[in-house]
């Protein structure tokens, strides 16, 4: 029986300090031996959002302990680790630098290869941690910082089909929650409040719904929510607005995903039609339910990461590290932190461009 690679994954791109040990079985299926995540919710709560300097300081204070916990929980020894994989971008540069520097130093100390990982690629491949997944597949990546449709051809091979031209979906959820007086991080609570409201009470806009192809826009929706929120006086109205917002998001994603299906099918002649939804917002149960229904309608196999792997974590970083290790795709210790690092580097940068569609 050949020794299987053991990879230490490290994540610090925003406000989670995380470490994980990843290996694989004889069939080549990834195995998560440990996955430790330390959240900074309490650190940023009073500010209503992530404060980069405070986040970086928290990473510095915790990262060595989190890595030790991950190694201890895995039941493996430091001298068994074959490579260290750290998130190098995209993200907050002061936060990225902590995990990146620690990972490089750790790899150097144990004289093992270092692997720089794209955080978005971690999300893109995360379903492989719980399910065998063949390329190509269509990916909807929805998180606090990104919202995009991607044709995933293989490791490091991505074709962007559409992206947000302004706010990310997770950002829209969090800002709506803030307008409703919900403490940070409020995005997940929108779904809870929506269960108690009337989703048809407010007719909210669906920007670029019938144009722009697979591109998305949420800034206009956020502005509309602000106008309604200013006049809310009762909890019932708050619940109704949350429900209306949730329903509007579902309608936007339903329509745009159908367009993405057609684009994906134009580019791929494969018989197996696979659709993956990943990122923090993929934990939204209403969105999951809607996507499952849509996949049945369009004969797609819908795949979602487990709930605990939707948000930022190091298991997905270790997974990318494992895949890169197997093809000896190692990184130089001088590899820089990249605040912006698109998966499809040939795609036009749209966010904030003020383009007209």
Positions of the model-derived regions?
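Glycine-rich phosphate-binding loop plus the immediately following alpha-helix
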Residues: 154-198, 222-233
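Conserved phosphate-binding/catalytic loops in two-lobed NTP-binding clefts
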Residues: 116-117, 274-275, 292-317
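N-terminal beta-alpha supersecondary unit
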Residues: 5-80, 86-90, 119, 123
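Short beta-strand scaffold segments in enzyme catalytic cores
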Residues: 17-23, 139-141, 147-151
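Short Gly/Thr/Asp-enriched flexible loops that form oxyanion-binding sites at enzyme active sites
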Residues: 86-112, 285-293
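Glycine-rich phosphate-binding/hydrolytic loop that grips phosphoryl groups
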Residues: 123, 305-345
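Conserved phosphate-binding catalytic cores of ATP/NTP-utilizing and phosphoryl-transfer enzymes
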Residues: 1-5, 116-138, 320
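A contiguous, well-structured pocket-lining segment that forms one wall/lid of small-molecule binding clefts
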Residues: 35, 77, 192-275, 282-298, ...
